[in-house]
Amino acid sequence: MLIFEKSRKNRRTLAHAIADKMDANDIPANLLRHDAPRLPELSELEVVRHFTRLSTQNFSIDTHFYPLGSCTMKYNPRAANRLASLPGYLKRHPLSPAPQSQAFLQCLYELQTMLTEITGMEKISLTSMAGAQGEFAGVAMIKAYHESRGDYDRTEMIVPDAAHGTNPASAAMCGFTVKEISTTKDGDIDLEKLRQMVGAKTAGIMLTNPSTLGVFERQISEVAKIIHNAGGLLYYDGANLNAILGKYRPGDMGFDVMHLNLHKTFATPHGGGGPGAGPVAAGPRLSKFLPVPMVGKNKEGYDWLTEKECPKSIGRLSAFMGNSGVLLRAYIYLRLLGKEGLSRVAEFSTLNANYLMKRLEQLGFTLAFPNRRASHEFIITLKPLTRAYGVTALDIAKRLLDYGFHAPTIYFPLLVPECLLIEPTETESKQTLDHFIEAMEKILTEIKTTPDLLRNAPHQQLINRLDEVKAARELDLRWYPIAKETEIFIQ
């Protein structure tokens, strides 16, 4: 129910003191309202109950196990929130001069240093405000590199069939023609097809390693050799960096540029449309094209590096320095863990994924890549169960809600039919994983005995199974009641 539908005429909350110097005459006439705003009329208690009730209906990492594949829904430590909200950071104006921002700039400089070491790259820019924007920046840098060499005919970007949807989108936005490369039955890039595909038009290839199939690209060195010998560059999508922290670096694999998803690997908040951060790191070929500003260090201290110091930069992607609050949270997360802690992140995220994968296989679920070890996530395909019982991946996802678990990613990657992409992350305990396994075992029994129970799930949520066709064709998304209902609050 919308809050407007609870409104009753003349119902009020507590009165608030009027500002001492408030005078409507001080406000320009064109900015004054001529009609009263359409606001609901409720008591303070009703408002508190309404929004508290809504908050309890959310699934989140703070309330439920959230094994959303390719999203790395790990716990965000509250210490990072507290420290990033210290007055010296929180109240700093974005245009404050560098001499008055030395502590802030030091944090960003040290974050740059740590991230370049983690990735094996030469330099990094922190200004991109989301992973997708960082990805766009990296592809734009590849384009700038080729154009600086007069290679205007390099117009093709190779993208695997298991790639994130943002990969071909970023390539297309930068003017490249996208060429799809297939993967083998074991999840590796098809090297023979890659050799046939590269040529004088090849600008580069975009890869995630481990891939979205949940397996490590075992022939990455050969892939890098093929692309570089053809005159192209390698772009690394940092979506799955969590699996290899402290173990293997993208720069050491041969990648030339990459972006990092701070909301995944480095425990900054997910969702809500932002704020986000997607730093871009580059090797020797591309570092001069990084977006500005960056933070530099000189004998006086720390300062901004802008277009003046970086004339080959692709330019600015954000106002000021990007989303500083998110960057500070990632910095604090890294300082809390240290090198050994980061290495344990990779170990436990991989351990949890493989434990969960093997247990589900033992129950009777079909693995998409049974001969491969999982990295940080894995895929089960429900195609045999769909054929036998008519139950789909969507049905299982809905039923998991009744057992108190957020559903894994479903129907992605697209090349695996009826799939669940499951990523438990390193912050989950064995007890939590065992509870999830128990739920999946019960669901498997339900599939074989009472499949209709799944087809109509969920049964214990505020909103049950929607008519998705009707919802898509007759979208009803609004913040206030319509027609007759509106009379409740505009009388």
From Swiss-Prot:
Its cofactor is pyridoxal 5'-phosphate. It comes from the Bacteria. It catalyses: N(6)-[(R)-lipoyl]-L-lysyl-[glycine-cleavage complex H protein] + glycine + H(+) = N(6)-[(R)-S(8)-aminomethyldihydrolipoyl]-L-lysyl-[glycine-cleavage complex H protein] + CO2. Its EC number is 1.4.4.2. Keywords: Oxidoreductase, Pyridoxal phosphate. The keyword Oxidoreductase applies. Pfam families: GcvP2_C, GDC-P. GO terms for molecular function: glycine binding; glycine dehydrogenase (decarboxylating) activity; pyridoxal phosphate binding. GO terms for cellular component: cytosol; glycine cleavage complex. It is an enzyme of class 1 (oxidoreductase). CDD domains: GDC-P. GO terms for biological process: glycine decarboxylation via glycine cleavage system. The modification N6-(pyridoxal phosphate)lysine is found at residue 264. InterPro entries: GcvPB, GDC-P_C, GDC-P_N, GDC_P, PyrdxlP-dep_Trfase, PyrdxlP-dep_Trfase_major, PyrdxlP-dep_Trfase_small. Belongs to the GcvP family. C-terminal subunit subfamily. The glycine cleavage system catalyzes the degradation of glycine. The P protein binds the alpha-amino group of glycine through its pyridoxal phosphate cofactor; CO(2) is released and the remaining methylamine moiety is then transferred to the lipoamide cofactor of the H protein. The glycine cleavage system is composed of four proteins: P, T, L and H. In this organism, the P 'protein' is a heterodimer of two subunits. This is Probable glycine dehydrogenase (decarboxylating) subunit 2. It comes from Coxiella burnetii (strain CbuK_Q154). The gene is gcvPB.
